[in-house]
Amino acid sequence: MKKIFSLVLLGIALFTFAFSSPALAADSVNGAKIFSANCASCHAGGKNLVQAQKTLKKADLEKYGMYSAEAIIAQVTNGKNAMPAFKGRLKPEQIEDVAAYVLGKADADWK
């Protein structure tokens, strides 16, 4: 019985680790610095100067399917429409940090 319990706990731990979000390990403080240097010219305060309806506010991120670290990472990495790709300009870890920062600010309504 003890062996089964241990195996179940191990399975839960492995499952949790395997499917954890990359934003959990990201550094939102570093993300704030990177955002300020690379993103704030168009997205200051969570706004969008190019497409005003597509802000970085939580409701808009949810509406447009962007309220996840994975979606933000893909957008920042590859760009889309008027937004440039940052794949060659930022390291993957830096992009993860930006995603963590954006999600944190969206949850706090950019205050």
Curated annotation (Swiss-Prot):
GO terms for cellular component: plasma membrane-derived thylakoid lumen. Heme c binds at C39, C42, H43, M83. Keywords: Electron transport, Heme, Iron, Metal-binding, Photosynthesis, Signal, Thylakoid, Transport. One of its GO terms (biological process) is photosynthesis. GO terms for molecular function: electron transfer activity; heme binding; iron ion binding. Binds 1 heme c group covalently per subunit. Residues 1-25 form the signal peptide. It is found in: Cellular thylakoid lumen. Monomer. Functions as an electron carrier between membrane-bound cytochrome b6-f and photosystem I in oxygenic photosynthesis. Belongs to the cytochrome c family. PetJ subfamily. This is Cytochrome c6. It comes from Nostoc sp. (strain PCC 7120 / SAG 25.82 / UTEX 2576).
